[in-house]
């Protein structure tokens, strides 16, 4: 990231236009579910579409994509721990503006998990409070100990709400 001053290479392959065109109003629903820190499972084939949808959604939240260092393990919390409160605001400096607004949001830090393609070996990580995962394995859909709040089905292009969202 340091060699690319804007971090544009992180956003390569994420097509927000395609995401909004394909998922329409459901794009906003998914974004709200991520912001509310719900348990979201994206299910379907191919894996490329699975990951592209998730990265496109995460890229809609300002400054989150370059700050996913805690996303792979629920016990990590470096983003929240290393955060410093902005003392001044410089409108000409993007980093200053983001820090003043409290961004990036710590959505995937402590007790949260983000894995665009989650293998069966990481099923224990789904015991945390919030997660966004992608899978092609039906075992995840029928897991009793850590059921998702929402299943996003790539085949049917629909959201299935399994739990009450409040």
Task: State each model region's role.
Residues 1-166:
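Acidic, Ser/Thr/Pro/Gly-enriched alpha-helical scaffold modules and adjacent low-complexity linkers
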